[in-house]
A protein has these predicted regions:
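Residues located in well-ordered beta-strands
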Residues: 54, 66, 78-80, 139-141
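ABC ATPase nucleotide-binding domains
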Residues: 1-69
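Short acidic/glycine-rich beta-turn/loop cap or linker motifs at sensory/regulatory domain boundaries
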Residues: 46, 82-83
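Non-catalytic connector elements of ABC transporters
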Residues: 74, 84-191
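Short glycine- and Lys/Arg-enriched binding-loop motifs that mark or flank ligand-binding interfaces
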Residues: 17, 30, 43, 68, ...
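Elongated periplasmic alpha-helical coiled-coil
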Residues: 70-73, 80
Length: 191
């Protein structure tokens, strides 16, 4: 089936399952299919369940680095937890010149303070002006752009060599958008 027909069929199958009132288990490697059809998703690796939850929970709050990398596209930053409170944490990453600030705490007692911060490309903005915040941004240059119709995927290289993927909706036919070799800032919110 072509993509358009496959998507329509997925929605029809979900409607039939709901009308009949049965529980179905479906095994797929197609992430879009799983996110479209399921109200609960289980992510497995090496025969073990890594995480079970709604598609929104799996995508927005992955329980592990493996789940974050497996579902969708993600930018990962390894770093050290330098502050951990009930309402926030800060992570310093050698890939970034500024700390990452997250508006909820991890509250771990682990001795190893190393961790990963995962940022989805669509959660990142690409301003040309330097953000005023002391956290959650980095300067870089547009290294490459993939135009994908409804959105463009920007690859921004930072001074440390880190490549950060940023997704921008193509809401205007033509606009004043960054292009190759432009100096830009990548910026994201606290959560």
């Amino acid at each position: 089936l072509d993509k358009k027909l496959r998507t329509e069929m997925q929605l029809e199958v979900v409607e039939i399952i709901e009308q009949v009132g049965v529980t179905c288990i479906m095994v797929t490697h197609d992430q879009e299919e799983a996110m479209t059809m399921a109200d609960r998703v289980a992510i497995m690796a090496d025969g073990w369940i890594e995480q079970v939850g709604s598609p929104v929970d799996i995508y927005e709050s992955p329980a592990s680095r493996m789940v974050a990398e497996f579902v969708g596209t993600v930018n990962l930053f390894e770093g050290e937890i330098i502050e951990d409170a009930a309402d926030h944490c800060r992570i310093e990453s050698p890939a970034l010149s500024r700390p990452i600030y997250i508006d909820h705490g991890i509250t771990t007692q682990a001795v190893d303070r190393r961790g990963w911060a995962a940022l989805r490309p669509e959660k990142i903005w690409l301003p040309r002006e330097q953000p005023s915040s002391e956290y959650n941004w980095e300067a870089g240059k547009v290294d490459d752009i993939a135009y994908l119709g409804g959105y463009s995927l920007y690859y921004v290289r930072t001074a440390s060599g880190q490549m950060i993927k940023v997704s921008m909706a193509n809401t205007e036919r033509r606009g004043d958008r960054p292009t190759w070799e432009d100096s830009v800032y990548v910026y994201w919110e606290n959560h």
